Amino acid sequence: MNSALAALIGLVLSIVLIIRKLSPVYSLILGALVGGLLAGWGLETTVAQMISGVKDITPAIVRIIAAGVLTGMLVKTGAASTIARSIIKALGQKYIYLALALSALLLTAMGVFIDVAVITIAPIAIIMGNRLKLSKFKLLLAMIGGGKCGNILSPNPNTIIAAENFDAPLSSVMAAGVLPAIFGLLVTVFVIIPLMPKGELMEGELQEEKDEQLPALWRSLIGPIVTILLLALRPIAGIVVDPMIALPVGGVVGIIATGHWKNMSACLSYGLDKMSGIAILLVGTGTLAGVIKASAIKDVLVGMLAGWSNGGTLMAPIAGALMSAATASTTAGATIASASFADAIVAAGVTAIWGAAMVNAGATILDHLPHGSFFHATGGSMGMSVKERLKLIPYESIVGLVLTICSVAMYLFV
């Protein structure tokens, strides 16, 4: 069987198994195995390609585990809640959608997972929604839209692994996402949300915010600022501080600055727990990426885009979008797309930095489909049923599409 068709069958099998609620990791490994065998490679060669795919992303997995220190600091010390509440308080009720979106953007941009960012902000959104009788759909889209914008400029696993597979500096890939993220935020808040139907309004008992012992805003910001400064040393001064060092150093400094050094173990355990799940998932995506990379599927995609103007450029976001749709995950989508198509994208004349940035942006278009955990975690945070949550999918995709179009336009015209 043609290796491109075989790899595609393996990918479809993985999707079906994930939808059927089988473990995503085992679904991806099984899909990779079936794809390789159908391609006629034999068991030994198939396994070799699967292991090769995992080896390619091993450095990124190590960096992602190290990033757990910063994530643990932001969530367990209360720094994330402080930052979100400060933004919402500063902008006030009149600009509540902007406040929620900006809070989600900044939290994800600092290294908080997008689903964790939404869950962190959701209690405040519910309180404000009940108080002002706002649409729960618009409230959730504001948080998800802001989170997607922050995700393309964050030191989160999707950006780390895209940069790694394209051999591009993480700080430069993050910087490439800044303007698309700002534009995406403005479009989300001032265009998409106003055009949405109101849907069901928030109704319920008015709740008061819990009086938690949270760190001061300036203390909460120290850890992320240290991380950003360390990563910025490469483009500014030519001093290379690897993300494997910068991210945990920023996290440890943040833990000390917020006065939670006695709870450092809890912060580290939380971060490791969040990242270990991603790391294990990436082992599965690595096996499938190895099979896809060894197949002729990239040649088929190149052939399909050959007649298009800027077809090589479009390969990056299209690959990101298709793979994120297959896995319903930004990280897994960016992993498979960048590991499988990076060489072809760079060979088409796209720079490594913008190749990684466009794959990353493309991975936000369809990463919220129902066979992924993000769909259910975010819907649950606002008390939505599956039927209600499904209504948001088109609007989420529009946000991702805006980010992608802006990223491609910046590469082509700026």
Stretches found by the model and what they are:
Residues 20-24, 58-60, 71-81, 108-120, ...:
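Short helix-coil transition sites and intra-membrane helix breaks within transmembrane domains
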Residues 69, 82-85, 115-128, 156-166, ...:
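Re-entrant/interfacial helical elements at transmembrane boundaries that shape
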Residues 65-67, 90-124, 283, 308-350, ...:
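Hydrophobic alpha-helical transmembrane segments of multi-pass integral membrane proteins
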Residues 1-2, 19, 49-60, 167-179, ...:
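Interfacial loop-to-helix junctions that mark the boundaries of transmembrane helices
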Residues 1-7, 11, 34, 38-39, ...:
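Long, contiguous bundles of hydrophobic transmembrane helices that form the permeation core
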Residues 1-4, 55-60, 87-102, 129-139, ...:
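Membrane-interfacial loop-to-helix junctions in multi-pass transporters
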Residues 26-29, 48-81, 106, 244, ...:
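Core transmembrane alpha-helical segments of multi-pass membrane transporters/permeases
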Residues 126-218, 351, 374-414:
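Membrane-core helix-loop-helix motifs of multi-pass transport proteins
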